[in-house]
């Protein structure tokens, strides 16, 4: 498929799991002789939640919770049908969200 590009975006709460998944995808794609660009680390989404510790008073006493979403992007240049088949067969952990754009 000349002139085509596949962009894979990975999201996860655990950065170690995310890096392992990205490494696995890159290895599989390199075995099919396609060119790979990445994994490129994208900015981490950080959401902060502040909650009162006491249900009645003591407004100065608060608890802070944080949620981080780590992201990576992989571009596959000049993919072959063999590359696409290999990508479909990869088993990734349940904590990793995969978004593929052609």
Swiss-Prot record:
Record PROSITE patterns: RIBOSOMAL_S10
Pfam families: Ribosomal_S10
CC annotations in GO: ribonucleoprotein complex; ribosome
InterPro entries in the cross-refs: Ribosomal_uS10 (IPR001848), Ribosomal_uS10_CS (IPR018268), Ribosomal_uS10_dom (IPR027486), Ribosomal_uS10_dom_sf (IPR036838)
Domain of life according to the entry: Bacteria
Classification via NCBIfam families: PRK00596.1, rpsJ_bact
Function: Involved in the binding of tRNA to the ribosomes.
Similarity comment text for this entry: Belongs to the universal ribosomal protein uS10 family.
Protein name: Small ribosomal subunit protein uS10
Gene (name only): rpsJ
């Amino acid at each position: 498929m000349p002139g085509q590009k596949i962009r894979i975006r990975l999201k996860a709460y655990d950065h170690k799991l995310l890096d392992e998944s990205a490494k696995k995808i890159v290895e599989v794609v390199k075995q099919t002789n396609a060119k790979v660009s990445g994994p490129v680390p994208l900015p981490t989404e950080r959401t902060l939640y502040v909650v009162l510790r006491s249900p009645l008073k003591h407004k100065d006493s608060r608890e802070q919770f944080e949620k981080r979403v780590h992201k990576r992007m992989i571009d596959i240049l000049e993919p072959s049908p063999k590359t696409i088949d290999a990508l479909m067969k990869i088993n990734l952990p349940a904590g990793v969200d995969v978004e593929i754009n052609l």
